[in-house]
Regions:
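His/Asp/Glu-rich metal-coordinating catalytic cores
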Residues: 1-10, 15-19, 24-193
Length: 194
């Protein structure tokens, strides 16, 4: 069993893809370590996992995966950090530092720099370099030549629409519906990617 040997967990975003296994690891696999994340990721991730549990609990394939108590146990281990706050690990991780940088993809989302001596490892998944209305894009200016960069290419094929055109289309659609005495419902991702 590897989970009891884990010294620290770094969480980058609050959605199921990034935090979904944590309650299971704490509740069923015996994980017992500090979990580092920004405060928004901590709070939204906890709400997201409550919601995930409540919407899936009656499905046969989900029963006994984890409980709400497992969610509480996992999120009680969180150590909230601020962007650019240097945190030093203790115990077997003595001498290892971690620092969160804004990922620009979700509220509180983080790119992580993990350092030991003169070597840095950067973990950067689901980041966005473009400034949006509610989030600044990420910047790698403070990260210089890491020994290892871990990233993803999940959005590489996604075509990014022109911001002005996109905004005009949604406003036109909303106004058209309202002018016909219709209702407008705008569903959003509960994990902070609004």
């Amino acid at each position: 069993a590897i989970a009891p040997e884990v010294d620290a967990v770094l969480i980058s975003h609050p959605d199921t893809a990034h935090v979904g296994a944590l309650p299971y690891a704490f509740g069923k696999l015996g994980m017992n370590c500090k979990v580092y994340a920004t405060l928004p990721v901590h709070k939204m991730g906890q709400m997201y996992m409550y919601d995930h549990f409540l919407t899936r609990q009656d499905q046969g394939d989900f029963q006994n995966v984890f409980s709400l108590d497992d969610v509480d146990t996992a999120f009680a281990a969180f150590m909230p950090v601020k962007y650019m706050q240097l945190s030093m690990l203790r115990g077997k991780g003595d001498g290892i530092s971690v620092m969160a940088y804004a990922a620009g993809h979700t509220l509180g989302g983080a790119v992580w720099k993990i350092g030991k001596d003169a070597e840095d490892v950067v973990y950067a998944v689901d980041y966005n370099v473009r400034k949006e209305r509610h989030l600044n894009g990420t910047s790698f200016d403070a990260i210089h030549r890491p020994a290892l960069l871990i990233t993803d290419a999940s959005s590489i094929e996604r075509e990014v629409p022109n911001k002005t055109t996109r905004d005009a289309k949604i406003v036109d659609s909303i106004l058209s519906s309202l002018r016909m005495n219709g209702n407008v419902l705008i569903p959003i991702d509960p994990a902070g990617r609004v």
